Amino acid sequence: MSWHWWKRNAAEGIVRILIDTNVLISAILGHGTPYRAYVKAVTYPHTAILCDQNVSELQRIFARKFPQKIPAMEHFLQLTYEAIELVAVPEQMIPAEQQIRDVADRPILRAAYAAKVDVLLTGDKDFLASGLTTPRILTPAEFLRL
């Protein structure tokens, strides 16, 4: 998958976007840039994708940091499940994940590859600094500018 492939398919409206946990948290808790990027990602002609690790991580973080917001998170997830594709994280490691410093983030990249996503939507500095070009790693603000 090259940048030219992505650009051509983006023009045709065929863009698969894996939404990382940090974007989901910000989308649930506010209505700023991450929320607007989430809405764009789940809106046709895009296909939004979550992996099972994102959902588990989201639930753990809300239980630990935002227990009073768990009902809002659960409601958000119920609505999200109607608009996204949920994928499992493959067990088989891929060579590209060595470029991700945080070992805990590597399964997210694995899921992105398995789901053949065009964009990984994240605010995670490890992904943003990785130098990966496939999938394209974008912040919510960058994604909104497309």
Give the ranges of each region predicted by the language model:
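Alpha-helix capping/helix-boundary segments
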Residues: 23-24, 54, 126-127
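Domain-scale selection of a single, long terminal region
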Residues: 56-92
